[in-house]
Amino acid sequence: FKNKIFTKKEILYCENKKNPASFYAKRFAAKEAFAKALGTGIRKNISFKNIEISNNRYGKPIIILSGSVDGFLKKKIRNKKYNIYLSLSDDKPWAHATVIISYI
């Protein structure tokens, strides 16, 4: 399952944590939240592996898009400048993610 959903970087990140399941759960929730914010859900051209959850140098969670997902978003918003805001939290055993896509 994890090899179908997560990138190699995400797997490495999660596996190096004390409680990997918690980190996988938050990242999975973020991918689902992004797909819903995009307005499509996961489908043919929207792949989990093309939505990577990472952290910036300050530890803030970020979404990195690649492949068909990046192209789909740019086409949908007509190549306008956009921002993706991501919030992750958990209250064991629950994981929660909120994604907002804004563009000008």
Give each language-model segment a name.
Residues 1-104:
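Core catalytic alpha/beta fold that binds nucleotide/phospho-ligands
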